[in-house]
Amino acid sequence: MVILISYFCFLLVFFLFTLILFIGFNRIRLI
């Protein structure tokens, strides 16, 4: 159970990091 929660948290952090990186890349490309 704890492993499942830690895995879900890791997946959520990875998704947020990828989303921020993608938005930042698009913003830099637009300028």
UniProtKB/Swiss-Prot annotation:
Keyword Electron transport on entry: yes
InterPro entries in alphabetical order: Cyt_b6/f_cplx_su6
Family statement: Belongs to the PetL family.
Q: Where are the transmembrane segments?
A: 3-23
Quote the protein name from its UniProt record: Cytochrome b6-f complex subunit 6
Tell me the membrane topology, using the record's own terms.
Answer: Single-pass membrane protein
Q: Which species expresses this protein natively?
A: Welwitschia mirabilis (Tree tumbo)
Pfam families per record = PetL
Q: Subunit structure of this entry?
A: The 4 large subunits of the cytochrome b6-f complex are cytochrome b6, subunit IV (17 kDa polypeptide, PetD), cytochrome f and the Rieske protein, while the 4 small subunits are PetG, PetL, PetM and PetN. The complex functions as a dimer.
Q: What does this protein do?
A: Component of the cytochrome b6-f complex, which mediates electron transfer between photosystem II (PSII) and photosystem I (PSI), cyclic electron flow around PSI, and state transitions. PetL is important for photoautotrophic growth as well as for electron transfer efficiency and stability of the cytochrome b6-f complex.
Biological classification of the source: Eukaryota, Viridiplantae, Streptophyta, Embryophyta, Tracheophyta
A cellular component annotation (GO) from this entry: cytochrome b6f complex
- Alphabetically ordered keywords of this record: Chloroplast, Electron transport, Membrane, Photosynthesis, Plastid, Thylakoid, Transmembrane, Transmembrane helix, Transport
Q: Where in the cell is it found?
A: Plastid, Chloroplast thylakoid membrane
Predominant location category? plastid
| One BP annotation, GO | photosynthesis
Task: Answer whether the UniProt record assigns the keyword Lipid metabolism to this protein.
Answer: no
One GO molecular function term of this record is:
electron transporter, transferring electrons within cytochrome b6/f complex of photosystem II activity
